[in-house]
Curated annotation (Swiss-Prot):
Domain ATP-cone: 49-139
Keyword set includes Transcription: yes
Top-level taxon of origin: Bacteria
Single biological process term from Gene Ontology: negative regulation of DNA-templated transcription
Keywords linked to the UniProt accession: ATP-binding, DNA-binding, Metal-binding, Nucleotide-binding, Repressor, Transcription, Transcription regulation, Zinc, Zinc-finger
Protein name: Transcriptional repressor NrdR
Cofactor(s) needed for function: Zn(2+)
Amino acid sequence: MHCPFCQHNDTRVIDSRVSEDGTTIRRRRECEACGERFSTLETIELKLPTVVKSDGGREAFDARKLRTSFDRALQKRPVSEEQIEAAVRAVVHQLRMSGEREVGSLRVGEYVMVELRKLDHVGYVRFASVYRSFQDVADFREEIEKLERELPVGSEQLPLLEAALERAGKPGKR
């Protein structure tokens, strides 16, 4: 590494310390030529893939755009900032772990939908309506019905079912 004081390219490491979170190493160095000391930081560089848009254009992955997508889908929904940040991190992690240099915007959208589905079903349907270009109410209905079919029936749903059966004149099971 070049010395920032005399530009000589021989320096030696005097001390190395790993940061608390284990993602950075601080190295104390000394120049062999002038004797000056300086510090460097070493971090892991994991490059995110380039996003290939549906029109064929390419752009660098932008985590802010990803966050904006989550924010729009979850606007006025009971989802915390921490939950949204965790979902963004999960998508970024998936992209990093893909090991690919390029990823289609459709795949990024699928990753987002997986995370939204875990967080909030209304947010999921909002995002799906834009992502899948819903044309009419039937498209919404179809997506909601698909979501309902895939959801496990929870114990909190049984009282609603019983109440509906009673209103219809059929005795509910107790």
